[in-house]
């Protein structure tokens, strides 16, 4: 989405290669030039699920020039353990060039409403208000988001179901002998060898996953954690797609 947003504004983007399927913060800092205006960082990252702790992330933000805006996309933050969840909003007082982006589409379960929010310095908010689209999020979506924001019990239950589903899929992949990237989100990046072939086989079996060749990961598929029966269906279909003798075990 970041390249698309960049191109839509007529800007030129610089993609910094990943390191160990995660962000290379040192390389990102080195890639900043006098022409750089915005840096996007997703944490936890999509589609790899890798995560950078708060101390390292704040150090990165502190080293970005003040005239460059840092957009910290924390769409999957609620899936982290409570002790690991980001405190980046408290950094804005020290780094007025920081925008923290959150969404209600993941742990809050409001994906169909397409609503999220950004927290930033008032001066940055004023600039965004001048250029944003004239039609804002509809009033029903706003009301739902406000109600969801106050329902901490639901969010914690959502995170718990996700942790249990993650363990279920990880155990199933281990039985199939399939490698995956440990994830801090609500999905797993799974190494199936030939992503396009296995994606097509799963689709024929009625299971939809996400191919990620466009991220430079043609051997992988991204699999969202579902309910227990959905996870089992995926694992069985994956076993069939891979021709595993354990698929029907």
Locate predicted features.
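PLP-dependent aminotransferase-like
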Residues: 1-41
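Active-site pre-lysine segment of PLP-dependent enzymes
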Residues: 7, 23-34, 47-70, 74-107
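Short beta-strands and strand-loop turn motifs
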Residues: 13-16, 38-44, 70-74, 181-183
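Conserved PLP-binding catalytic core of the aspartate aminotransferase-like
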Residues: 18, 162-163, 171-205, 221
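PLP-dependent enzyme catalytic core of the Aspartate aminotransferase-like
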Residues: 55, 59, 201-205, 210, ...
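PLP-dependent aminotransferase class I/II
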Residues: 97-181
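Short acidic/glycine-enriched loop/turn segments that link adjacent beta-strands
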Residues: 112, 184, 216-219
